[in-house]
Amino acid sequence: MKLLTINSIEASSICDNKCDYCPAKEQGKHRDTGYMSMDVFRKALEWVEWCARRGTQQELNLFGVGEPTLNPNIVQMCRLARHILPNSRELHFNTNGNTMTEELALALKGAGITHIDVTLHVGYAKNPKNVSKTIQMLNENEMMRPGGISVDPIIRPNNWAGQVDWPDSGIRFQCPFLTKGQVMIMSNGDITTCCIDAFGRGIVGNVFDSKPEDIELKPFDLCETCHSRI
């Protein structure tokens, strides 16, 4: 499968939570982690623009395996991405809500973000009032979509293809990455064939030394234990 769309750009591969069901806390042992720099982000947007010119770019998620609002440039990133992304395509990300403020939310809305989804994970258990305020605030500012609250680790649990010790519900979905030509650009510019590739095992290139037209998407070892099917 050839590359068709940049599904995700990982604004941050660092998280301020340490959830048992998420590999974010361990991924620094396996790959470079941190906040995506503006140089890397601008280069990643060139790949988005390449897909957009061909009419294949779909939604863009500024979320990978980390908390995007920790990146101090997240508003600027949204503004630049909105300029490149076709108007009909959604620009969004997920947040744990820990650091979301109304000032930040309105700045993101002004920068062109379509919606923000909230994950009810460890942060909610520790500080439900703060995360509930975030949800209320985003709703009041029309920045959440119906069903924009994630409780997947409870109602549709999976073990991230064996990367964490967590129950697997057995629910199977078709893999959108290998069947629809999607990739995620990681915080250091590496390109992976899968959005749950926390440890960087499916790298197929880098935005600086690869060309979009040369990217080939193929199954890799995580596919064998993944909850998605090809």
Positions of predicted regions on the chain:
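Conserved alpha-helical substructure of the radical SAM core
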Residues: 1-115
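General alpha-helical segment detector with a strong preference for membrane-spanning helices
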Residues: 20, 41, 71, 150-154, ...
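Alpha-helix boundary/capping residues
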Residues: 26, 47-48, 112-115, 138-141, ...
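Short, well-ordered coil/turn elements that cap or connect secondary structure elements
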Residues: 55, 86-88, 144, 199, ...
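Accessory C-terminal segments flanking Radical SAM cores
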Residues: 3-8, 162-230
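Conserved AdoMet/S-adenosylmethionine-binding subsite of the radical SAM
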Residues: 71-181, 186
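Short, solvent-exposed loop/turn segments at secondary-structure junctions
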Residues: 14-16, 27-29, 68, 98-100, ...
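Short aromatic-enriched loop/helix-cap "lid" or pocket-rim segments at secondary-structure transitions
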Residues: 20-22, 74, 104-105, 128-131, ...
